[in-house]
Amino acid sequence: MVDIVTRVNNVVNGFVWGPFGLALLFCTGLWLSVRTGFFQFRRMGYWLRHTIGAIFTNKDVTAHTSKEDMAISQFQSMCTALAGTIGTGNIVGVATAIVSGGPGAIFWMWVMALLGMMTSFAENVLGVYYRRKNEKGEWNGGAMYYLTDGLGAKPGCKAVGRVLAVLFACFCILASFGIGNMSQINSIAGNMNAAFHLPYLATGLALMAVTALIVIGGLKRVAAVTEKLVPLMALFYVAGALIIVVMHAGNIPAALAAIFKGAFNLNAAGGGALGYGISQTITWGFKRGAFSNEAGLGSAVMVNSASNVKEPVHQGMWGVFEVFADTMVVCTLTALVILTTGVVELESGAVLAGVQDNALVGRAFTAAFGSFGPKFIAVSILLFAYSTTLGWSHYGTKAVEYLFGTAGSRIYKVVFVCMTVVGATMKLGLAWDLSDTFNGLMMIPNLIGVLALSGTVVDITRNYFARRVRGEDIEPMWSAFEEYQKEEEAEAAAEEAELDKAANK
């Protein structure tokens, strides 16, 4: 039975993460970039000012919502989304890309990220535009909703939209237990055992207790943790990586040359048939790029849609920044650490004798930090992997709620918490492979919806810049539903009246 499941999984995985799936992901990002006039480059200063820049200049971005308001702040939604995307893939995944595809894979990882910025932008614009409130007053958004109410509203597409939404939700639930929970916890337990000799079961029980306290408390509690955890873990890892890169600054030109030269090298990584190398390089770069930032998978949309933002484009810009931070910053630093410390051969990506790709980053940190290196990586993986678990707990919760309502989501949370112990104590080879496939299967229905609704994304974006930049007096496109549109307009009018009142005092 296991052999049959393995063979079927290999076929499906080869489809979703093979040439078809990666080409679909690439072409979607390219199409959206063209349709928006390459927004990610042309408006780079604008989206940086309204995301990371706004954290320091606009208190509304970081201010917590009231107890009665079930939404979370823009900063909290960004941190929770990054919690879900910044994981072990940013450490081990980058090493795998270099070993399997050579240093040139990093170039193609960048390409996928640069195009993926607009896929993430479109997902989040649609997520906010088609979101709905549940009986508790929480915003529910994501691919399930823009497939049902967006694609499903097109002539003859009602059944198609609904079926794709159900498939997406099912794949998301299955992926949340694997790549969003057990695989991450297993990675934590293994590294804590290797670095600090902690028993696997002890790690699992400790993480189960902490997860129960956070996850069962709902999104607001998850967001309250991630808004502190994500900046901390990012600063911790980035600081350590920067120290190593600066220590080996003289090797940076050679590392960058290897990346750009290797991107178009016909020889395979580690040797191989002529012409096969560039195919492997592109494939591994694209695959690891997609894994690291999840643009196109539709996962982070579910938490970004819970933001207290009114403008869909504002949340879309946060999506652009999330991909930028995940891949262009964190993954790039990991790559430079590997390529500047001499643990791989720059021409081929071949590793030092006796070193496996999953230990490559640890070897690089050990070369720089000595015996502290493995401990640094163990703590980094603890923070990265556990934050991923918190983010995915919300994704799975919302997928279950879409299918079974809020009662079902409560049961899901209990099961999710219990699975942390399973993840810490079991060997998960097949489980990892299956969850990887389910993660990819989420991408197909999501990208169908994003492509079908790309015109809506363009219309919303043009409406935003017409009002906010050119000052045109036109009705905003905030929601696809009249009741929420009027509600948002009433809130905006009240806020404007308060500002006028304060200005006249």
Segments (PLM) and residue ranges:
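Helix-loop-helix module between adjacent transmembrane segments
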Residues: 32-33, 112-137, 148-186, 190-214, ...
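Extracellular/periplasmic helix-exit of transmembrane alpha-helices
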Residues: 123-136, 242-258, 266, 270-273, ...
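Alpha-helical membrane segments and immediately flanking helix-loop junctions
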Residues: 59-98, 126-129, 135-151, 173, ...
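Membrane-interface loop-to-helix entry segments
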Residues: 24-49, 164, 168, 185-192, ...
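Membrane-interface alpha-helices at helix entry/exit sites of multi-pass transporters
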Residues: 67-71, 102-111, 149, 153-166, ...
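Flexible loop linkers connecting adjacent transmembrane helices
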Residues: 38-72, 96-106, 110, 118-159, ...
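N-terminal alpha-helical transmembrane segments of multi-pass membrane transport
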Residues: 1-84, 88, 99-105, 116, ...
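Transmembrane helix-loop junctions in multi-pass membrane proteins
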Residues: 4-5, 35-40, 90-94, 176-189, ...
